[in-house]
Amino acid sequence: WVRTPLLPTNLGARRTNLTLRDAQSINTRWSPLLGYFPNSPWGTLSITNNYSKSLERREATGTTSRSLSLTMPDLILSMNQLERIFGTYRWMSSASLNSKYSLRKRLNYEVDESRDINLGGDLHFVIKQVYDMTLSYDESKGTTKNFVTRLTTRQDKRQSGSAGMGFNWRIWRVNTKFDFSQSRGYDALGRISQDSKVMSPSIGLRGDFNLPAGLRLPFSGKRLTFTNRVILSSSLKLDRQSSQLNVEQTNTDNWNWNLNGDFQIGQNLRASLGSSFQLFKNRVLKDQDYYIYGLNTQVIFQF
């Protein structure tokens, strides 16, 4: 048993540190409407809950401490076939919704207590069997209270969301996305300790196609066939950051572009070529602007 007392042979030995940790976790999944509506979209409703608890006791050089971590509830609700519920099945398909809520507590006995609440969800659907759409949103709030000073030493809030669309255009797969996040935090005196806002639009392209060709060998009736498979991918992204703190360093625009190509000429010969370009601009201090570019290539022979 792991908690069997240590029995040192040295009579002068003393225990210097000790850590005891007890952890419990329970995971459950429930489909409350499946038995009542087996062939209905309501029957796809599922509820998942995770429960976890951890109690830790420490002793170091005669100083003892205890801490408790508790996550309850940690709920996830999901449902599919939403187009049948809203009657939008003529132009919408594969609609699914996931929503979540969690509460996490951490207690350091006689020291402080922290609470973090998180809620959010994501929605996915396809329009006209062409446009693959994804929407998501998350929000979290956190507080920390000190039992000694009886002050709230931490208050913060974070919000984030994204919207993405993907579709096929001829031989290309096009993916567009827009990410947004902002956070704000305050210390025990009510001063702003954290402030950040980031917007990130991006677009990506990927193509996979073949350009078959052949070469007739001289003095022979045989023909050497080349696969000529080409995979091209490229992306462009902007990270625009804004903040009221450390204004000279936190108000920036960061552009990133890359282009990669993979060429499979035959079964035994493949080549790849890549390029990248980064442009960094500081909207306050112009002398900190810079750019970076790179090129790489690789040829692979297989025998």
Can you describe what each PLM-predicted range is?
Residues 1-303:
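Exposed, low-structure sequence patches enriched in small/polar residues
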